[in-house]
Amino acid sequence: MKTPASLESLITALRVLPGVGPKTAQRMAYHLMQRDPGGADRLARAIDHARSHLKHCARCNTFSETELCVLCADDQRRQDVLCVVEMPADALMIEQTHSYDGLYFVLMGKVSPLDGLTARDIPLEQLARRALDGTVNEVILATNFTAEGEATAHVLATLFKDRGLSVSRIARGLPVGGELEHVDAGTLAQALYERRRLSTGDA
């Protein structure tokens, strides 16, 4: 039996989600159409609303509905420490540790040579402007301990070499190959606390 074109289009669209293969996308599509049509409507409206209202924070590059996100607009946060993460979910995980009160910069990506993603695919110029605006004394590199995260940290360390900033890397208490969003709060808090300063030779 041939799948209707509109249903096939929905299945294909759902496959853009990370970790969703053909079978999972098919199950999702059937569920939305048969068992939860109201949910399908809410999902469509929520996606449309998010696309219409979300933009990037002018300072940290995370998603925000205003020019500055909630954290960047909070003058009670430390202004002299900047933690660089790959994705908004990573910053959220660090916030949940309640062990960091500085600010963030979200790359919205990473360096991944195998995927054809180079340093030109992350906002290095915007990050440099933010880190070198005169208020930041320390940059914490909190990219994942994956091959891509390490490559990204190397690029960032090179960027800030000889710029007069203290550059540190979160400690290797995190498992090799581990991603921040999957690490428990206690382990992540300890990794932040035990962060090591990078020397010129590390860049």
UniProtKB/Swiss-Prot annotation:
CDD domains referenced in this protein's UniProt entry, alphabetically: TOPRIM_recR
InterPro entries assigned: DNA_Rcmb_RecR (IPR000093), Rcmb_RecR (IPR023627), Rcmb_RecR_Znf (IPR015967), TOPRIM_dom (IPR006171), TOPRIM_RecR (IPR034137)
Entry annotated with the keyword Zinc-finger: yes
Keywords: DNA damage, DNA recombination, DNA repair, Metal-binding, Zinc, Zinc-finger
GO biological process, one term: DNA recombination
PROSITE patterns per record: TOPRIM
Cystine pairings recorded for this chain: none
GO MF assignments: DNA binding; zinc ion binding
Domain Toprim: residue ranges: 80-175
Zinc finger (C4-type): 57-72
Function: May play a role in DNA repair. It seems to be involved in an RecBC-independent recombinational process of DNA repair. It may act with RecF and RecO.
Similarity-based family: Belongs to the RecR family.
Protein name: Recombination protein RecR
Annotated organism of origin: Laribacter hongkongensis (strain HLHK9)
